[in-house]
Amino acid sequence: MYGKIERIHFVGIGGIGMSGIAEVLLNLGYKVSGSDLRGSEITQRLESLGGEIFFGHAAENVANADVVVISSAVHEDNPEVVEAHLRLIPVIPRAEMLAELMRMKYGIAVAGTHGKTTTTSMVATILSKGGIDPTIVIGGRLNSLGTNARLGQGQFLVAEADESDGSFLLLSPTIAVVTNIDADHLDFYSGIEEIKDTFVEFINKIPFYGLAVLCLDNGNVADVLPRVKKRFTSYGLSAQADFRATDVRLSGFSTSFVAHHKGVRLGEITFSMPGAHNVLNALAAIAVAMELDIPFETIQEGFAGFGGVGRRFHLKGEANGIMVVDDYGHHPTEIKATLGAAKAGFAENRLVVVFQPHRYSRTKELFEDFVKAFHDADVLILTDIYPAGEAPIEGVTAEALANRVRRHGQRDVTWISDRDKLCEHLERVLAPGDILLTLGAGNVWQVGETMLLRLKAAKES
């Protein structure tokens, strides 16, 4: 960045996407400040790295800023945004700042409706194992790093490309991965055709020497292939995919498969994350790594040491023979994949699911898809919608969803609004051998942590 930019202020710095960029900028030597409504492990980490954190949004927070960075969740009437405009301080979306970081490196951007965080994490892990030492900006905590960002000394930057508001079009990656294209963020897009058009534009932004890595198993990705004008490779379980997986085996938290490239057997891959959907994510990472000439043996070693990602089928703990697992899945496609992975890996265990819908708009637009997403749950409890800043929509409630799921044939479905009553209900329902899975992008993970404490206390009493 131009030398006169010294102090960078983030509105909503505690968000997982914002904090990663802030951490890299701190490590680059910039003065970073930011505001958020409350403290967290993320804000504490940024403070320990030298960031200045304000709690609450106030005009004076931007007084010394040279640029203000906002996420799509921050509105124009935010007092810090208003003040920045009054002071003629540039206000830019987070994707524009990420694009500026990517401009300094060769960018590897992972896009897609689902699987971005896991795939980005796999790519980052394997590139690190291969000695490339990439800069990393991930939308989740990489367990092996203990954080979601790292400044590397190598030439590459690995990051997620967020399609939710179209701002990923600001990025100009050298390698672009598209894991899938699905209907989501319909408060921004008019429908699936506009989403597909936007992904095509993203793919075609790579340079002539770049590479697109595309999932052939996804119907919407396959649909847009004739419109891709740049060099690409495909991956999937399909026999037509360039990178293909066979002999997939799922057992507990472990997944293994045999990888092939254009009909040639490469070897076996094993990693500690369940689910056939993660086989696809792994294939994407293999394709990226082999484009960068990382030996397959090194790729195997990288996967063997892959520790997973926070809030992606993450084992929180175990007590009284009950495993407590948390997952970020909040879209019907993600929910079906996660529950399917749980059933495939733990066929003998009863699956007790607590789901917190995320956003009124998403719940409304995908209501019927949600209704059909929970068939692999033995016990399903829904709690109130996490608004994520949205105003309620009349008739769109977790209770209405629970009733519709029940009418669709799901036998054991309960809606509980109050958290204490929810935990009391779980204490009555859970039995040794069960898996308690909290699902959602909001704060439903707190239910799992509370239940772990209660289960351990019950064991000691």
Curated annotation (Swiss-Prot):
Against InterPro entries, the record matches this protein to: Mur-like_cat_sf, Mur_ligase_C, Mur_ligase_C_dom_sf, Mur_ligase_cen, Mur_ligase_N, MurCDEF_pg_biosynth, UDP-N-AcMur_Ala_ligase_MurC
Q: According to its UniProt record, what is one Pfam family this protein matches? A: Mur_ligase_C
**Can you tell me which residues bind ATP?**
112-118
Give the Enzyme Commission number: 6.3.2.8
**Its GO biological process terms?**
cell division; cell wall organization; peptidoglycan biosynthetic process; regulation of cell shape
Q: What UniProt keywords are attached to this protein's entry?
A: ATP-binding, Cell cycle, Cell division, Cell shape, Cell wall biogenesis/degradation, Cytoplasm, Ligase, Nucleotide-binding, Peptidoglycan synthesis
Catalytic activity entry: UDP-N-acetyl-alpha-D-muramate + L-alanine + ATP = UDP-N-acetyl-alpha-D-muramoyl-L-alanine + ADP + phosphate + H(+)
Report the superkingdom from the record: Bacteria
Citing just one GO molecular function, the answer is: ATP binding
The compartments listed are: Cytoplasm
Q: To which pathway does this protein belong?
A: Cell wall biogenesis; peptidoglycan biosynthesis
Q: Which GO terms describe its cellular component?
A: cytoplasm
Q: Which family does it belong to?
A: Belongs to the MurCDEF family.
Q: What function does the entry list?
A: Cell wall formation.
This one is known as: UDP-N-acetylmuramate--L-alanine ligase
Say which species the protein is native to.
Geobacter sp. (strain M21)
Q: Report which gene this protein is encoded by.
A: murC
